[in-house]
Amino acid sequence: MFMKQLVKHLIIAGFSAAILSFLISFDAVYTGFSSSFGGTLSHFFIHSFLLIGLPLALFTDAVHRILHLKRTHTLFTKLGLYATVVYVSWDSAVWLAAAMAVYFLIECAFFPVGRAKETTISM
């Protein structure tokens, strides 16, 4: 089970990094590090994979495990989280943490956790 999850996260992170690298190569996404490091496409891919794609894939899975949700990741919430991180917070770890907190709150608000049924004892 662990290897299956790991492979799933690597695939999600790889596709996310590939899309982000593609957008960066066409200047669709502004990045602060592109001018300072000279940035090649492989540099963008590695940066996106290690610093954005993989941590977010692991984080979203952890949220699902903590909340004991019985559904798979939805494309909408994951893309919303990625868009928030890329658009607002490329260089800021604080904004990345804020985006993750918002994602967690959205999951808590819209997808309620299954609670154990309360039993009443009649006397």
UniProtKB/Swiss-Prot annotation:
GO terms for cellular component: plasma membrane. The keyword Transmembrane helix applies. This is Uncharacterized protein YugM. Keywords: Cell membrane, Membrane, Transmembrane, Transmembrane helix. It is found in: Cell membrane. The chain crosses the membrane at residues 7-29, 44-66, 79-101. It is a multi-pass membrane protein.
